[in-house]
Swiss-Prot record:
One of its GO terms (molecular function) is zinc ion binding. The gene is FYCO1. Expressed in heart and skeletal muscle. The modification Phosphothreonine is found at T381. This is FYVE and coiled-coil domain-containing protein 1. It comes from Homo sapiens.
Length: 1478
């Protein structure tokens, strides 16, 4: 609520301020007089404005605790602004004001008096940084709309004049409520006199009033007025011409105003068109984003369909493999059945044979009791006969009983055999039933195969459909790739259009700038017209004054009176006197006439030159018009090309939208097909499971058959045992028969001995027949036994074959199990592949999301760029406003300068009047005529010079005005062409919009038709899916019926529970194992899911680490780039130090021994030979005078003083072993001696050859110069315990052609550094006095290693900025700054410093890039500067254009790389224009 109340109060205050402004403007218009402090509307305005300035202002205070107010805000904003600074300085000059509030009120009153309040406040509000630092967010000055409204209201006060006293009020307490009346008009206490040239109008007014008073006080009786009247007609003609020109200029001003309005309208229309184009670009960008999203979705769906197709193909291959395995298993099963049938047929035959043999045996057994009965009867008869004859022995009875028992045992065995035969028959029946069941199962399998055929056909058809879909997807991908290329082309074209748009905006800005420039020119022209009007008024006044003087002269020259004779006598007496006066007066008159004629000639010459300049300006204007017309034509061509590109873009966008719609429809159809494929895959999986169940049943049947084979083996073993038992019984029977035969023979023999008659023979015959029969039976039994043995052998062979077959079947089963394992592995591989595909899909989704994020970031970046462009445009607008305000301020200053020029002309008139007064004084004082004439001559010469200067200034102003007029004419000529172009562009834009609307309507209609087609296709696909689902349901029913039949078969096989128990147990175990495997698979899946999640987390972490690594890599690369030089330096230092350490360790003992002798010798040489700097002012060899450029150098051997060029030789000292500077004579002496192997001209280091320097070669100069210390302190060579950096620098500097060694710098005066910090201006001409052979800098440029070259121009140096730039100089290298200068007279200044140590500096001049380096001139030789301690300043004046190379040399340092911080400036020469005399 508080915020709303504050806002409502703020709005009310702004409305009150607006009402006060309107009241002030009305009061000024009605009264026609300036507004004073008596006005109540002024009181209201001041209070409201102060409230707004203090509203929501931050509380600030000074160090003393005084509160800061809006006066400090004005100072912070306007302290550096030209024009507004005058008011601030004026308020600060008022000592009466003590508080910040009073100073702010005085500044507001100053701005009202000078009509600058709106401009100053606008400049303050444009400085948003300072405003936000002084005000909170609720302030109206931080709200652009409210601030613009306030400034727009205050701009109405620029036309209102205020008459306010600058002093006399206590502004610290309150605003003044009444107007203070001044007592004297010239009192300076109540006048606004800001301390500046631009605002001092009171001095001009006072001087103008003084000139009028002086003109009115002139004496009209002077004879020089006649001379002044001679130029009156010419002045009148000039006035007429000026009036005509004024009319023309006014008409031109009106035309330019109209053209300016038209241009503003055209610019506004162009801005609207740009906004529409921006909106279209935004819509196109949104469409592109939507297209990219659709393309990403299509890619995802295509990847999903591709994965499904891959899985379908893999499943198809698995099904084919399973079908092949099933077919192979069926073939193996059929072959096994055939083998078993082939094996069963001989077994059946053998069983039939055994049955026949058993029947025969039964028959024999049935006949055997009869035979036994007959034998018993015979035995009874025999016993009767024997009993009659002899009693029968008891042993035969016992044997007979045993035979009976044996017969009973045989009967029992026969019954057992019959039971075995029955069991075998039952088993055969079971086998037959099983064969029937197998045949039924085979028939069902054949049915399933037949049913699978259409399914396979459907699968093949779906595979074809999938292939078609794949082809479509490939085509779609090709289309998408083509569309992506088109999108890329569209983006490129869009970028090109944006660039062209930016170019057009730049051209519009340039046009606006030209318009502003034209407006400023128009303002200047209007100002000039006003100045001409004022001059016209002054000339009219002068004309009136001259006419009055003429009338006075005519009155004085009236009719002669009666005193004529007396006057004639007096005249006759005065004739000689008059003649003498005329002779004395003729000379100045002639001189005055000569001056006037010279002035007329000058004016004529000026007019001719003005006409020529006008013609040249017209020609230039015509050329500019032609250029503008050409530019307009180019702009029209660009606009047409942009419009054509825009139409093509719209067409492409429409085509892309249509293709996207078709892609969406095709994607929907692909999704439906994918659903159908998933359903078919489910059906195939169900069929696969059914096949697995059938295979399990077949395995169970095979196991049952194996059990039956085992039973058969057991039966064969039992048969073998029975055959062996029978064989034993036969043997026992044979033995019994033999015993019986023996008994019979014994009996017969006994009977024969007893002499029995013929009946015994008969009985013997019968017994023999019986024996023969028994033998025959025995033979038959033996044959049967042999046959049974053969059968047993055959059965054993068959059993072996069956076992072999069983082994084969087991091997086949093992193969099948291996195939099943392979299938399982394949299934697992498929699962893993599926999971891998899912992972890849997830990764692709992540990549897509990342791409989307990148695209969003790109969009955000584009939005930021557009916002930055808008901000830049706003800043440019603000800058343009600032420039317009500055132009207005400059306009005001020009007006003030013109007023000054008018006052100067008035002063010239005063001087002319003074001349006339002096002439009258000459007539009155004839004695002083000669002196006064001389004084007049001097004054006339001075005045002539001033007039000539004024005429030159006026000519320059006239030329500038003519150029401005020409530019205005050119701009006016270009306006109608631009208007026509804008009209054509608007018509084209309207036509383009209409065409775009029509194309959009057609595209919408096409899209609706395509949508209807795809909907019908979707309905057909749905119907096909329904039919396929029905077929699948029928197949499921058939499968259910087959399963029911299988269950019935299982029910029939329930009787074989005992045999199948083992198989059921095995199956249960298998199922348990399967359950375990399923559980393990579930656990593995969970593990996989966990691992996937962990992998995703790991991938995210890896990506984060990768990003961090990338950042670290970039940082390391940057650091590596910075540290490469340091590493090279360290490697060099390492190698060099290793070498030097060995050398120094060797030389250490010798140095210890030589140190005392060296000190003693140096002291002797210093005492005996060393000369002070003041003892020699010229070089002792070449007699050149020492100066800053030619410095003093002591020879370290003889101690005399030479210049650098005469003392540029180095020789190894005898005691210290160091290279020291010496003169030519000492160098020749030492070189002739045998003890200086290294005394070469250049003084190369040991083991490092370097080019020798000639004695005349200009080397670097020592930094000591004139101020070298007379008390020379030699380097302390007695201390060699620690190898310091300075010693290493001495070693490395001794082998190079560099400026000086550290011993030299130590020996020089410390004032040398002060002399090096500032270098005087040098030119190429200054180097002509120097010797020619300056080889060290040129050798460095030729053979030295360049690190960095930074070419600069004068314009780049002019825009160098306030800060310094960095230049890197690696060790043993140098860096170069070539400055190309195209004009002479410039002054190039530099300031540089180095880090961490000093650096050498030199300047070399080169005429052009093609000139060889041998022809270059050394302006400043190589100088070692202590730039690491203080800034080195210097400057150079350019007298010949060319290339000035600033060389920063670091070749003397082999280990330390350095950074140079430099700042360059350019000063142009000041052209004297005589403005001091205005």
């Amino acid at each position: 609520m508080a915020s709303t109340n504050a806002e409502s109060q703020l709005q009310r205050i702004i409305r009150d301020l607006q009402d006060a402004v309107t009241e002030l403007s009305k009061e000024f218009q009605e009264a026609g007089e300036p507004i004073t402090d008596d006005s109540t509307s002024l009181h209201k305005f001041s209070y409201k404005l102060e409230y707004l300035l203090q509203f929501d202002q931050k509380e600030k205070a000074t160090l003393l605790g005084n509160k800061k107010d809006y006066w400090d805000y004005f100072c912070a904003c306007l302290a550096k602004v030209k024009g507004a600074n005058d008011g601030i300085r004026f308020v600060k000059s008022i000592s009466e004001l003590r508080t910040s509030l009073g100073k702010g009120r005085a500044f507001i009153r100053y701005s009202l008096v000078h009509q600058r309040l709106a401009d100053t406040l606008q400049q303050c509000f444009m400085n948003t940084k300072v405003t936000s630092d002084w005000y909170y967010a609720r302030s109206p000055f931080l709200q652009p709309k409210l601030s613009s409204d306030i400034v727009g209201q205050l701009y109405e006060l620029t036309e209102v004049q205020f008459d306010l006293a600058s002093r006399g009020f206590d502004l610290d307490a309150a605003w003044p409520t009444f107007a203070r009346r001044t007592l004297t008009t010239g009192s300076s206490a109540y006048l606004w006199k800001p301390p500046s040239r631009s605002s001092s109008m009171s001095s001009l007014v006072s001087s103008y009033l003084q000139t009028q008073e002086m003109v009115s006080n002139f004496d009209l009786n002077s004879p020089l007025n006649n001379e002044a009247l001679e130029g009156f007609d010419e002045m009148r003609l000039e006035l007429d011409q000026l009036e005509v020109r004024e009319k023309q200029l006014r008409e031109r001003m009106q035309q330019l105003d109209r053209e300016n309005q038209e241009l503003r309208a055209a610019v506004s229309q162009q801005g609207e068109q740009l906004q529409t184009e921006r909106e279209r670009g935004r819509t196109a960008a949104e469409d592109n984003v939507r297209l990219t999203c659709l393309v990403a979705e299509l890619q995802k769906q295509w990847e999903v369909t591709q994965a499904t197709q891959n899985t379908v193909k893999e499943l198809q291959t698995c099904l084919q493999g399973l079908e092949l395995g099933a077919a192979e298993k069926e073939e193996d099963y059929h072959t096994a059945l055939r083998r078993l049938e082939s094996m069963l047929q001989p077994l059946a035959q053998e069983l039939e044979a055994t049955r026949d043999s058993l029947d025969k045996k039964n028959q024999h057994l049935a006949s055997f009791p009869g035979w036994l009965a007959m034998a018993q009867q015979k035995a009874d008869t025999a016993s009767d006969t024997k009993g009659r004859q002899e009693p029968i022995p008891s042993d035969a009875a016992q044997e007979m009983q045993e035979l009976g028992e044996k017969l009973q045992a045989l009967e029992r065995e026969r019954t057992k055999v019959e039971e075995v035969n029955r069991q075998q028959s039952a088993q055969l029946e079971q086998l037959v039933k099983e064969l029937q069941l197998k045949e039924d199962a085979r028939a069902s399998l054949e049915r399933l195969v037949k049913e699978m055929a259409p399914l396979q056909e459907e699968l093949s058809g779906k595979g074809q459909e999938a292939d078609q879909l794949w082809r479509r997807l490939q085509e779609l991908l090709a289309h998408t790739s083509s569309w992506e290329e088109e999108l890329a082309e569209l983006r490129r074209e869009k970028k090109q259009q944006q660039e062209e748009k930016e170019l057009l905006e730049q051209e519009v800005r340039s046009l606006t700038r030209q318009l502003q420039f034209l407006e400023t020119q128009l303002a200047q022209v209007s100002q000039h017209v006003s100045d001409l009007e004022e001059q016209k008024k002054q000339l009219i006044q002068d004309k009136d004054h001259l006419s009055q003087q003429v009338g006075m002269l005519e009155r004085l020259a009236g009719p002669p009176g009666p005193e004529l004779p007396v006057a004639g006598e007096k005249n006759e007496a005065l004739v000689p006197v008059n003649s003498s006066l005329q002779e004395a007066w003729g000379k100045p008159e002639e001189e005055q006439r000569g001056l006037q004629e010279a002035q007329l000639d000058d004016t004529k010459v000026q007019e001719g030159s003005q006409e020529e300049e006008l013609r040249q300006a017209n020609r230039e204007l015509e050329k500019e018009l032609q250029n503008v017309v050409g530019r307009n034509q180019l702009l029209e061509g660009k606009l047409q090309a942009l419009q054509a590109d825009y139409q093509a873009l719209q067409q492409r966008e429409s085509a892309i939208q249509g293709s996207l719609a078709s892609l969406e429809a095709e994607q929907a159809s692909i999704r439906h097909l994918g659903d159908q494929m998933e359903a078919s895959l489910l059906a195939v999986r169900k069929a696969k499971e059914a096949m697995k169940a059938q295979m399990a049943e077949k395995e169970a049947i095979l196991q049952s058959k194996e059990g039956e084979c085992q039973q058969l083996r057991e039966e064969v073993e039992q048969c073998q045992q029975l055959a062996e038992a029978r064989h034993r019984e036969l043997r026992a029977l044979e033995s019994q028969c033999q015993q019986q035969t023996q008994l019979i023979e014994v009996l017969t023999a006994e009977k024969g001995q007893q002499g029995v008659g013929p009946p015994t023979d008969n009985e013997a015959r019968e017994l023999a027949a019986q024996l023969a029969l028994s033998q025959a039976q025995l033979e038959v039994h033996q044959g049967e036994v042999q046959r049974l043995q053969a059968q047993v052998v055959d059965l054993q062979a068959k059993m072996r074959a069956a076992l072999d077959d069983q082994d084969k079947v087991q091997s086949q089963l093992s193969m099948a199990e291996a195939v099943l394992r392979e299938h399982k592995t394949l299934v697992q591989q498929l699962k893993e592949q599926n999971e891998a595909l899912n992972r890849a899909h997830v990764q692709e989704l992540l990549q897509c999301s990342e791409r989307e994020g990148a695209l969003q970031e790109e969009r955000a970046d584009e939005a930021q760029q557009r916002e930055e462009e808008l901000r830049a445009l706003q800043e440019e607008l603000s800058q343009a406003k600032c420039s317009s305000e500055e132009a207005q301020l400059e306009h005001a200053e020009l007006q003030e300068q013109l007023h000054r020029a008018n006052t100067d002309t008035a002063e010239l008139g005063i001087q002319v009047c003074a001349l006339t007064v002096e002439k009258e004084r000459v007539e009155e004082a004839l004695a002083c005529a000669v002196q006064e004439l001389q004084d007049a001559k001097e004054a006339a010469s001075r005045e002539r010079e001033g007039l000539e200067r004024q005429v030159a200034g006026l000519q320059q102003e006239k030329e500038s005005l003519q150029e401005k007029l020409k530019a205005a004419k050119a701009a006016a000529g270009s306006l109608p062409g631009l208007q026509a172009q804008l009209a054509q562009a608007e018509q084209r834009a309207q036509s383009l919009q209409e065409a775009a609307h029509q194309e959009l309507n057609t595209l919408k209609f096409q899209l609706s038709a395509e949508i209807m087609d795809y909907q019908s296709r979707l309905k057909n696909a749905g119907e096909e899916c329904k039919s396929l689902r029905g077929q699948l349901e029928e197949q499921g029913r058939q499968l259910q019926a087959a399963e029911e039949a299988v269950e019935k078969l299982k029910a029939t096989q329930a009787d074989m529970g005992e045999k199948l128990s083992c198989t059921s147990n095995h199956l249960a175990e298998c199922q348990a194992a399967m359950l375990r495997k399923d559980k393990e698979g579930a656990a593995l899946r969970e593990d996989l899911e966990r691992t996937q999640k962990e992998l995703e987390k790991a991938t995210t972490k890896i990506q984060e680490y990768y990003n961090k690594l990338c950042q670290e890599v970039t940082n390391r690369e940057r650091n590596d780039q910075k540290m490469l030089a340091d590493l090279d330096d360290l490697n060099r230092t390492k190698k060099y130090l290793e070498e030097r350490l060995i050398e120094l360790l060797r030389d250490k003992d010798a140095l210890w021994q030589k140190s005392d002798a060296l000190e003693f010798q140096q002291k002797l040489s210093a005492e005996e030979r060393w000369l002070g700097d003041t003892e020699a002012n010229h070089c002792l060899d070449c007699k050149r005078e020492f100066s800053w450029m030619v410095r003093r150098h002591h020879c370290r051997i003889c101690g005399r003083i030479f210049c650098y060029y005469c003392c540029n030789n180095y020789v190894l000292s005898k005691h210290g072993g160091k290279k020291e500077r010496c003169c030519r004579a000492c160098f020749q002496k030492l070189s002739e001696g045998p003890g200086s192997p290294d005394s070469s001209g250049s003084g190369t280091s040991q083991g490092e050859p370097s080019p020798a320097l000639s004695p005349a070669s200009p080397g670097p100069q020592a930094t000591g110069g004139q101020g070298a210390n007379t008390d020379y302190r030699p380097p302390d060579d007695a201390v060699f315990d620690i190898i310091t950096d300075e010693e290493l620098c001495q070693i490395q500097e001794s082998g190079s052609s560099l400026p000086e060694t550290p011993t030299e710098t130590d020996s020089l005066d410390p004032n040398a550094a002060e002399q090096d910090t500032t270098s005087t201006s040098l030119t190429p001409e200054d180097t002509e006095d120097m010797p020619v052979g300056q080889d060290s800098e040129i050798c460095l440029l030729k053979s030295g290693e360049l690190m960095i070259k930074v070419p600069l121009t004068v314009d780049e140096i002019a825009s160098f900025g306030e800060g310094s730039r960095e230049l890197f100089v690696r060790s043993s290298t140098y860096s170069l700054i070539p400055i190309t200068v195209a004009e002479a007279g410039l002054t190039i200044s530099w300031v540089f410093s180095s880090d961490p140590k000093s650096i050498s500096f030199s300047v070399v001049f080169q005429e052009a890039e093609d000139t060889p380096l041998d022809q270059c001139k050394v302006l400043i030789p190589t100088t070692r500067c202590n730039s690491h301690k203080e800034n080195i300043q210097g400057q150079l004046k350019v007298r010949t254009p060319g290339i000035y190379m600033l060389i920063f040399d670091n070749t003397f340092s082999r280990f330390v790389s350095k950074k140079v911080f430099y700042h360059l400036t350019v000063d142009r020469p000041v052209i004297y224009d005589g403005s001091d005399f205005l």
